[in-house]
From Swiss-Prot:
Residues 135-159 form a coiled coil. It comes from the Eukaryota. Residues 23-35 form a propeptide. It is found in: Secreted; Nematocyst. Residues 1-22 form the signal peptide. GO terms for biological process: killing of cells of another organism. This is DELTA-thalatoxin-Avl2a. Is lethal to mice, and may cause hemolytic activity.
Length: 498
């Protein structure tokens, strides 16, 4: 065994271990706190099967998938050439039925709930990656302009959990097509702010997906969601009553096995009938024919019969995911292809998810003025590139941006500005809970100076700001594996120079 192989193996093992130990533990508690959880034991007679494992090991382009409101079918892309399930999975029998409810006091808490339950990174808790799922369960009333609140009644019969072994994920042969397409990617992106520069990377994500299913939980489940716009100002109890009535109808609303539903009064039911909310019933797992029959208002016998199917006929009710770039980085550390896996990760997180498309305008001389761009960080290393999203310097860019105003002051931009290249920043609060610094040509009155200076009774852009501001940094995605890769590449170069 060569010294290089020994060193690389040891460093890779150490890096993966350190990542697991040092990566931040995601806070899975959100404001959609589960209340009054009731648990009962069931006997599981079913054995692990292709049906119970579902899409385990398959790749999906998560931002196109509805992870909440329908049965998630095993129609993903092949990622591994050979992945023997009996050898590569750890299956744990669960055997519990849980009844609880989750209150979502904001759109952010709904996003957090989806990210937590699917193990999708908190940094991807936003509209690009999870927007399709949130829109599906709220009937599109959740948007960048509209905040929502809501509640779900959750009936979950857990049969078993099947999770891929880390050793198999890191060592089993990848699909020959995936390997061929990945290794054909460009290592160096010459103009990272242009989407066309990332065409092959985008095609790879579309073909193989951004994430693979790392864990499948099977059983049978029923979720009754109710949502309304936050400005309607319904309280927690109003959502609870509406969910109970929506699930079982007015006559059986108090008989569905939830503590919050048990005390529903006739007066509350009548009041709820006049409250307009979005209702969504989601049935997952169990038998296909049983799922198809569970529509509209359900009686307690229907509910219990379906939940018990978890004992004998479980199918997937929940999936947990892992990014495809994590698998590729682990596979290609210490090789010339590692940079491509880093590129893929930062392109997805920074360019696509954060939303760092190239924005520009023209000044009074028709010269191009850049507003936002995805570019290399100053400290970027070709072996493991680092990118940033940055916005143009705030203030004037051209003399025509500056306008003399009475009382001897200069306005930058404004409603009558024709140049429209006086750039201004604003911080937008996203409904996913995060914030984003944005840059735009200022058309509002009162934006004084900002590079404009008085020259007699005229104003000129005599002191323009030259400093771009970073709004997203790929340095946040750097980890121990990147450091190990750079050590290995440096050693390889030294060995080749001997």
């Amino acid at each position: 065994m060569s010294p290089y192989f020994k060193l690389s193996s040891a460093l890779i093992f150490l890096a993966i271990t350190m990542e697991a130990l040092c990566s931040p533990i995601e806070n899975t508690s959100t404001s959609n706190k589960d209340n009054d959880k009731e648990t009962e034991h069931i006997e599981i007679s079913a054995k692990p099967s292709g049906i119970s494992r579902g899409a385990l090991g398959q790749g999906f382009e998560i931002h196109r998938e509805d992870l909440l409101s329908k049965q998630f079918e095993a129609t993903g892309e092949k990622i591994f050439e050979d992945l023997p399930m009996d050898e590569c999975t750890v299956t744990t029998t669960l055997g519990t039925i849980e009844r609880d409810d989750s209150f979502y006091n904001s759109t952010e808490s709904l996003y957090q709930s989806v990210a937590s339950s699917t193990k999708i990174s908190g940094s991807l808790k936003g509209a690009y990656t999870l927007g399709v799922s949130v829109a599906a369960v709220t009937n599109n009333i959740a948007s960048s302009e509209e905040e929502v609140q809501g509640l779900s009644l959750n009936l979950k019969a857990y049969s078993m959990s099947s999770i891929l072994k880390k050793n198999c994920v890191n060592t089993k042969p990848l699909s020959k097509d995936l390997v061929s397409d990945f290794e054909a990617l460009d290592s160096e992106i010459t103009k990272p702010w242009k989407l066309s520069s990332w065409k092959k990377y985008k095609v790879l994500l579309e073909k193989y997906g951004s994430h693979i299913v790392k864990e499948s939980i099977s059983g049978s489940s029923i979720y009754q969601y109710v949502f309304a716009k936050s400005n309607q100002k319904f309280n927690h109890r109003s959502f609870t009553v509406k969910a109970c009535v929506s699930l079982a109808g007015p006559k059986n609303a108090s008989k569905v096995g939830f503590a919050g539903c048990t005390g529903v009064s006739q007066q509350e039911i009548e009041q709820s009938s006049s409250q307009s909310m979005i209702k969504k019933l989601v049935v997952r797992g169990g038998k296909t024919e049983t799922r198809a029959s569970l529509i509209g208002e359900l009686d307690p016998d229907q509910i219990n019969k379906f939940l018990i199917e978890a004992e004998t006929d479980p199918s997937p009710i929940q999936y947990k995911f892992e990014p495809i770039w994590t698998i590729l980085k682990n596979r290609y550390v210490g090789t010339e292809h590692f940079a491509k896996a880093v590129n893929l990760e930062q392109f997805y997180k920074g360019f696509l998810h954060f939303g760092c498309s190239f924005l520009h305008t023209s000044n009074a001389d028709n010269a191009d003025v850049e507003i936002q761009k995805f570019d290399f960080a100053k400290t970027s290393d070709p072996d493991a590139p680092t990118y940033v999203c940055k916005v143009g310097p705030e203030g004037c860019q051209h003399h025509e941006d500056c306008h003399y105003r009475a009382a001897f002051w200069c306005e930058c931009g404004g409603p009558y500005d024709l140049a429209r290249t006086c750039l201004r920043y604003k911080t937008e609060k996203l409904n996913s809970g995060s914030t984003k610094r944005e840059c735009y040509p200022n058309k509002e009155s009162g934006f004084a100076w900002h590079g404009c200076q008085l020259h007699g009774l005229s104003c000129w852009c005599s002191a323009p700001n030259k400093n771009w501001e970073e709004t997203w940094s790929g340095e946040d995605t750097n980890n121990a594996l990147n450091d190990v890769h750079q050590v290995l590449m440096e050693k390889k170069r030294r060995d080749q120079a001997k």
